[in-house]
Amino acid sequence: MRLALSVDPEEVALLCARWPDAGVESAALAVADPFLTGEHQLLITDRRRAEICYIMHRGDPAEGVLLHIKTFYPAGAYRLPTGGIHVGEAVLETLTREIFEETGLTVGESGDTVRVERLLGVLRYELQHTTLGAVSFATYHFLVQMPAGAVLDPQDPDESIGGWQWRPAHDLRAVADVLETVQVSSRVWADWGRFRALSHRFVATQLGA
């Protein structure tokens, strides 16, 4: 596998063979600068081909899934954590790396590690950008369980994590609403908020929330 595309057919086939209930859905969004071109919104730079999103819970997503906010985000813009998949890097490698960098927790099978429960699905985007033209991207959404008694301890200061929240899964649509209305307080972050809202609605649907 060359692992250069946002959705590599062979890689997705292997993931769906492991988690047969997972599928690929598509979404289209018209966007403009500074989304994809401005500081902190460079989604497709650093050789990123796609991203993972981990939906971390402590035993029951209905009781709480982990959200974070970065120090440079608009006020109140908490969201599900994501991390860029580099060209040549496998989706599951990225998942392991990003969870450790952002939380200090290790993915594995033992009781003191984060357990990957399943792939909820892939959301493929066709972004129509006023400057860049058509841009393809994708988010791979994984449901993972945090080990009992674990403490969140970010390892990479460049992640700039400013805080955490635990929110019941049924709040994810409300979280999406907040992200979509970021444009009211900050036009600079408007398209970023609209884009990020899509993942939260997708996850809410997959979890039946």
Regions found by a protein language model. Give the residues of each.
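Nudix hydrolase/Nudix homology domain
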Residues: R2-A4, A75-G76, G149-A209
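Acidic, metal-coordinating catalytic segment for phosphate/diphosphate chemistry
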Residues: L3-C53, G59-P61
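Short connector loops at helix/strand junctions that flank enzyme active sites
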Residues: R49-E51, Y73-A75, L80, V135-T139
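Unchanged
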Residues: I85-V182
